[in-house]
């Protein structure tokens, strides 16, 4: 998973510098808020909302030009509002997920690693990540 900036296709944003002069909605105190605060230019108008629903509603209703949120929240918003023509702009922070197995379960651990490696090599992980998260899986550990 990752936290990123999302916005309309017709708004050119490739990185933090492009946030200048734009209004970005973010959930107060969330990871996205902390990461956005580190990189947003002084001229960016960061509007903080109390929860994800309020943040997304502000973007959908046009109160903000851009949305800083997690991939799953943005994916849901884009699926429910295709008329917005929203898209992924750039990553604020990667938040990888991990699979844990009980200590000493080497057979299981090796099998899980084998399945992941096969999915990575075949491109299946990238295909699923693009479908569900809007971008490739990225550089996964071996």
Residue ranges and their predicted role:
Residues 18, 70, 104-118, 124-128:
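Short amphipathic alpha-helical coupling segments at ligand-binding clamshell hinges
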Residues 11, 47-61, 93-95:
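Short helix-initiation/N-cap motifs at beta->coil->alpha
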């Amino acid at each position: 998973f990752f936290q990123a900036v999302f916005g309309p296709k017709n708004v050119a944003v490739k990185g933090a510098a492009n946030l200048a002069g734009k209004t970005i909605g973010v959930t107060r105190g969330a990871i996205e808020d902390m990461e956005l605060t580190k990189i947003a230019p002084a001229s960016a108008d960061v509007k903080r909302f109390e929860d994800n629903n309020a943040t997304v509603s502000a973007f959908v209703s046009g109160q903000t030009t851009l949305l800083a949120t997690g991939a799953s929240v943005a994916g849901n918003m884009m699926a429910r509002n295709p008329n917005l023509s929203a898209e992924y702009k750039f990553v604020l922070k990667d938040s990888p997920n991990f699979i844990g197995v009980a200590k000493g379960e080497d057979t299981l651990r090796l099998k899980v690693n084998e399945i992941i490696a096969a999915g990575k090599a075949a491109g299946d992980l990238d295909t699923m990540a693009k479908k569900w998260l809007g971008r490739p899986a990225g550089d996964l550990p071996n």
